[in-house]
Amino acid sequence: MRLIRFLILFPFFLFPHADDMYLLKGGNVFLPNVGFVKKDILVDEGLIISIEDEIDSSVSENVINSDGKYITPGLIVFSALGLIEIGALPETIDIRSETYNAGFDPSDAFNPFSQAIRLNRSKGVTSTVNIPSASGYFAGLLSYTKINNGLKQKKQAPLGLLTSYGQSYDDSRAANLMFIEDLFSYVRNGYDSTKADQIQFFYGTDNEYRFTKRDLEAIQKVISKEMPLVVRVNKATDILKVLEMAKSENINLVLWEANEGHMVAEEISKAEVPVIMDPLNNIPGSFDSLNATYENVSRLHSAGVKLAFYYDQSSGAHNAYLATQSAGNAVALGVSYNEALASVTSNPAEIFDIKNVGVIAIGYDADLTIWDNDPLELMTQVETVFIDGSKQDLSNRYDELTERYTKEEELPNSYRSR
């Protein structure tokens, strides 16, 4: 064992002063299927290259004493980070489209300098699954983006195609199922992407839903199982219909919200369909959610459903990091601690097959967050964040404003420029 450990570390003794090599020493490390274990982590060239009980400090000049600290994978949130700055100003909103629906990918408009990104990064978030909101039958494509400092971010897209089923449409639920069955049949059997005259497909006498070539190509990826269909649905009977539709169409499915999922938890589990949800969403905001309850998350968890958590989407992008509060409350509601933390780290990556992130393991991207205490506790603070092995700037406008207006100066606050 000593020989193997020496062989692993030998190359790093040859270059002990590499600027991008970090040794995280003595932290409580959250490991897959284990939980927190005291370990040393060696990071180099953006990757986790060693996890040991003890790594000699001489391998790197960048040693971070993590004794008593908690080290987790960076948080993966579901949000509009980098795509919305102020919800009340349309010019700062890039998640919407009137031209495209199924083929709409808002990630091309990602703004890495958004103040919301700085805030969330300082709270332990290292990446986001971007949530679209196009105006057609489909909301658009989900995509994955890291939120590191600088102009270049790693992206993975598309992850899935988002739509809704239930009360969100004026037409009958039955008609909506017929519509999607007809649309899938058209794409599967009649659509030829090589023909110029197939550039648009209009459905219905009023042409209410328009599909461009780009949209139809996105739907084709769902049919060929290159990505899942993500359905925002809440009513128990609607959930069953969506499960039945996915089985008959032979497509991969992810449920979003599922406020009445607890009523059909066994059926969701048997179908092996994951659920993305806010554990605190217990208010019957519509007739689709009359049976919403705090017990939803614990019943789904007990049934064996894979879960991923987000914080209330209506709060905008700035508060996406509060997914840790959702996870902490899920523990109080009956979800195991390890599974709750996985629901904001590894589970989003597994659900959407996001490569090399979400867990602390050798060969994975060094997206790491160091906390001063239990990461699901409300008062815990983030001390250090790594994205792709690069130590991140954790300054944010909230802290800058606090520093400005709590500093004693000769002139009143109104005279301050900085």
Regions found by a protein language model. Give the residues of each.
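Hydrophobic h-region of N-terminal signal peptides that target proteins for export
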Residues: 8-17
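Active-site core of metal-dependent hydrolases
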Residues: 202-293, 372, 381-397
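Sec-dependent signal peptide recognition
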Residues: 1-9
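C-terminal cap of metal-dependent C-N hydrolases
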Residues: 27, 39, 362-405
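Polyanionic/metal-chelating signatures
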Residues: 121-253
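Histidine-rich, glycine-flanked metal-binding segment
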Residues: 29, 33-72
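His/Asp/Glu-enriched, well-ordered alpha-helical/loop segment
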Residues: 87-88, 92-96, 101, 228, ...
